[in-house]
């Protein structure tokens, strides 16, 4: 066994009919985690329903349907491998909760793959003014997804026309530039997801195509296929060197062991012997042990779902939504208020100061008041349009001062991304999403346990 490949997360974006499912399905199918039996079963069903030609998309539709019915399908199905990476497709948009998932993102994407339909008229529809594509690309960029690959799909429908491809590259370069990406760092790859052309092996249909190239930190990388472009993603920097932030998902009381908080390490590391602080509870104590899947861990790192045992803390003192951090290294604190950039997605009316919906930020679920609408901004450029607007409505972006109804721990997105983005829920749907720009932290002295005092003396 060589060293385990690095894991990367990709998100696939693009217009409804750009062929995202077929393309993603094809990658998973050819390089992926779907076992032969499942594939044969799907193929048989697809053939019976006369959808044989659709088999790659069909694979994905099956997975999606099962996912939406709440059947947790083996997430391995959404994985595939390149020579360098284990790739996980963390979401395929078109999925109705795509925007919410991107925001509360169970995981941060390292790279976005934008699929553009090359067909006549299709391309134009896909990136028109109100296009979804723009929205998804903008969202990816706003949420810190800094790497992008553009796949120009359905090249078979325009007979692999070189001029068409170049025209699309020119237009798309302008488009991604407006969103914030530097086109020189973006590989543009012509493909046919339907035929699987130029996805994994270089196509023989476009002798004119010399391959893609992109600028990287180290210089330049080149290749021909989509798989090579994914393999050329810059290795992600995992936030192990940041101070610890671990939002609690649950707190258990386990006989003979005591209090065991459980959650995912978002940044930093957690290990036995550390003195940690829970915010906004304001409790400081020592970590006795850390485990994952019932095995002791030397340390938990970002991405690990861990349980850890703490001394002298009762289950009543800490709860889901609290954040655990290192008491000696930028410990987490509660906040009195925070300022965020909020984009209203679908609200039937107008939102004005005083509006108090529920915010989902990391694992916290707390009502927050829109205290002051500070400015309205153009969501395409980020430029200010007016100061202190009276209200905002669907489609608007604004800077808002928010006040939580009870103690809450959040962070600026630039410091700790997973704790700096949120979804606004009201009327059983996501009405807005936001990114936190700054936080007014509250300083309250909390409880320091005997275990923590003892550990501090060591």
From Swiss-Prot:
Q: Where are the N6,N6-dimethyllysine residues found in this chain? A: 3, 316
What InterPro entries does UniProt report for this protein, alphabetically?
A: EFTu-like_2, G_TR_CS, GTP-eEF1A_C, P-loop_NTPase, T_Tr_GTP-bd_dom, TRAFAC_GTPase_members, Transl_B-barrel_sf, Transl_elong_EF1A/Init_IF2_C
The record's GO molecular-function terms, alphabetically, read: GTP binding; GTPase activity; translation elongation factor activity
Ranges for region G2: 70-74
N,N,N-trimethylglycine is found on: 2
Q: Where do the tr-type G domain residues begin and end?
A: 5-240
Subcellular localization is given as:
Cytoplasm
Source species, domain of life: Eukaryota
Q: Where is this region: G4?
A: 153-156
Asked whether the UniProt record includes Nucleotide-binding among its keywords, one would answer yes
Q: Where does GTP bind?
A: 14-21, 91-95, 153-156
Q: Which SUPFAM superfamilies match?
A: EF-Tu/eEF-1alpha/eIF2-gamma C-terminal domain, P-loop containing nucleoside triphosphate hydrolases, Translation proteins
Which residue stretches belong to region G1?
Answer: 14-21
What are the GO cellular component annotations?
cytoplasm
- Pfam family example for this protein? GTP_EFTU_D2
On this chain, the residues bearing N6,N6,N6-trimethyllysine are 79
Q: Where is this region: G3?
A: 91-94
N6-methyllysine found at: 3, 30, 316, 390
This protein's pathway reads: Protein biosynthesis; polypeptide chain elongation
Q: Which UniProt keywords apply?
A: Cytoplasm, Elongation factor, GTP-binding, Methylation, Nucleotide-binding, Protein biosynthesis
The segment annotated G5 runs over: 192-194
- Location (main, coarse): cytoplasm
NCBIfam families registered for this protein in UniProt: EF-1_alpha (TIGR00483), PRK12317.1 (NF008969)
Q: What functional role does this protein have?
A: This protein promotes the GTP-dependent binding of aminoacyl-tRNA to the A-site of ribosomes during protein biosynthesis.
Instruction: Spell out the protein name for this chain.
Output: Elongation factor 1-alpha
Native organism:
Meyerozyma guilliermondii (strain ATCC 6260 / CBS 566 / DSM 6381 / JCM 1539 / NBRC 10279 / NRRL Y-324) (Yeast)
């Amino acid at each position: 066994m060589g060293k385990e490949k690095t894991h990367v997360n990709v998100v696939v974006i693009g217009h409804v009919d750009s062929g995202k499912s077929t393309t993603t399905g094809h990658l998973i199918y050819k390089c992926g985690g779907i076992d032969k039996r499942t594939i044969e079963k799907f193929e048989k069903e697809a053939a019976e329903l006369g959808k044989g030609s659709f088999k790659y998309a069909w694979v994905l539709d099956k997975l999606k349907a099962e996912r939406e019915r709440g059947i947790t399908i083996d997430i391995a199905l959404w994985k595939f491998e390149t020579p360098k990476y284990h790739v996980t497709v963390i979401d395929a948009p078109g999925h109705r909760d795509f925007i919410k998932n991107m925001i509360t993102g169970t995981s941060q994407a390292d790279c976005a793959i934008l699929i553009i339909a090359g067909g006549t008229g299709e391309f134009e529809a896909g990136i028109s003014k109100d296009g979804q594509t723009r929205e998804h690309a903008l969202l990816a960029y706003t949420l810190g997804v800094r790497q992008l690959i553009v796949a120009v799909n359905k090249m078979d429908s325009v007979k692999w026309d070189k001029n068409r491809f170049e025209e699309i590259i020119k237009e798309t370069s302008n488009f991604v530039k407006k969103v914030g990406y530097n086109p020189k760092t973006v590989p543009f790859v012509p493909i046919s997801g339907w035929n699987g052309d130029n996805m994994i092996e270089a196509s023989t249909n476009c002798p004119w195509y010399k391959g893609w190239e992109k600028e990287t930190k180290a210089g330049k990388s080149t290749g021909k296929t989509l798989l090579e472009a994914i393999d050329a993603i810059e290795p992600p920097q995992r936030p192990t060197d940041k101070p610890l932030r671990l939002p609690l998902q649950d707190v258990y009381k386990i006989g003979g062991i005591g209090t065991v908080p459980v959650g995912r390490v978002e940044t930093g590391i957690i290990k036995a012997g550390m003195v940690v602080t829970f915010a906004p509870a304001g409790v400081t104590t020592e970590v006795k042990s850390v485990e994952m899947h019932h095995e002791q861990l030397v340390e938990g790192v970002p991405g690990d779902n861990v349980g850890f045992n703490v001394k002298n803390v009762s289950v009543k003192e800490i709860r889901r939504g609290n954040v655990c951090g290192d008491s000696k290294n930028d410990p987490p604190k509660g906040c009195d208020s925070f300022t965020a950039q909020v984009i209203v997605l679908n609200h039937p009316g107008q939102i004005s100061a005083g509006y108090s919906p529920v915010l989902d930020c990391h694992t916290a679920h707390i009502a927050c008041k829109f205290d002051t609408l500070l400015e309205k901004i153009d969501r395409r450029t980020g430029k200010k349009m007016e100061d202190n607007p009276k209200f905002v409505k669907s489609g608007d972006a604004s800077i808002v001062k928010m006040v939580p109804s009870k103690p809450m721990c959040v962070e600026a997105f630039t410091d700790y991304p997973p704790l700096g983005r949120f979804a606004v829920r009201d009327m059983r749907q996501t009405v807005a999403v936001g990114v936190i720009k700054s936080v007014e932290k509250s300083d309250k002295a909390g409880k320091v346990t005997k275990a923590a005092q003892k550990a501090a003396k060591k």
